[in-house]
C-alpha cells in the first residue's frame, strides 16, 4: 500500500475512482526533519493538499508509515461482455469515448488492438476487442452492461460474448465465447515473463501514457510509427513482414476527456547488446510520447527510467518549488537521491 501511494499509481478500475489519489483520506510520513501528518477528513478545500504533495513523491520527501484509506465492499454482482470492432482507433474515439462520457462507471473498459488480441490468444487478430465490465456490491449491473453494449453497437461493435453473475448462482448467465479471460491470464503473467523473454532472445518493453480524445488518433499513429521504425532500426530487422517487431496497443483506462494508451514492444534481441537496445528504444518512444503532448507515465511512476522526460513535462516553476520542498524536508538529500528532483 505504501508503494502504491508513493508512486501515485492507478488501480485496475478502467473508469471513475481508480488512482490512489482518490482513495487516500490521510497520510503519515517520516522525513529527516520530522513527522508529516495530515488531518483525516472526508474532503477539504483548505488550500493545496498536504496529502497530494506526499502522494507520488516516490520516497524523495519522506517514508510513508501510515495511511487512512477509503475502501469499497467486495462486489457481489458482475456483468461483462467482449465486443469486436473492425478498427482500433475508430473504436477508441467512437465507442469507448462515448461509453466514458456516458459516465456509466464501468470497472473494465479495455480496448485491445488486433495484434495484442492475437498475441495474448484473446482473438484471431482480425478484430479489436473491447472488454467491458461492471460490478457492484449492492445491486445487479446487467442494465448498465446493456447500456454500454448498446453504445458500442451504435459505433459498429459486435458482441462476441457476455456474462452476468449474481450471488445466487456461481456461473451466471453466459452467452457465447470471448477472449476476456484469455487476455486477463496473459496480462497477469506478462511481468513475470520479461526476463524469460530476454533469455530467449526477445526484447519486451511497455510504454504507458495518457492523451486527450481530440489528439488521440494522431498521437496513436505517430507513436506506433515511431516505435516500428526505431525498433526495426535498433534490432536490424524489417519494420514489416515476417520477423518484424510486434508493436501493439491497448487502452487501460478511459476518461470523459481522454484515454490512457499502453504500448507493448516485442522484438528480436541482440545477444550481449540487450541493454543498449533497450536504452535506444526507451529514449525514442519516450520522446515521441512527450512531443505528442502525452504524459511520460500514467500509472507506472517516474523513478529513474522516466526522469529525463518528466523534467521536460513539468513546468519549470513547479520543478523549482518541488526542489524547495525537498530541501526543507530532506536538506542532506538522503532520501532516494536523483528521483523527481536533484541531479
Predicted regions and their residues:
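FAD-binding subdomain of flavoenzyme oxidoreductases
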Residues: 1-110
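Short hydrophobic alpha-helical segments that form membrane-spanning helices or hydrophobic packing faces
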Residues: 10, 65-67, 219-220, 307, ...
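A short, flexible low-complexity segment enriched in Lys/Arg and Gly/Pro that occurs
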Residues: 25-44, 269-280, 304-313
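Acidic/polar loop patches that form or flank catalytic/metal-binding clefts of enzymes
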Residues: 36-37, 106-108, 158-161, 297, ...
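C-terminal substrate-recognition/cap domain of FAD-linked oxidoreductases
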Residues: 73, 79-87, 92-284, 288, ...
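Small/polar glycine-rich anion-binding or flexible loop at a beta-alpha turn
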Residues: 115, 254, 296, 301-308
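Activity-critical C-terminal alpha-helical subdomain
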Residues: 303-343
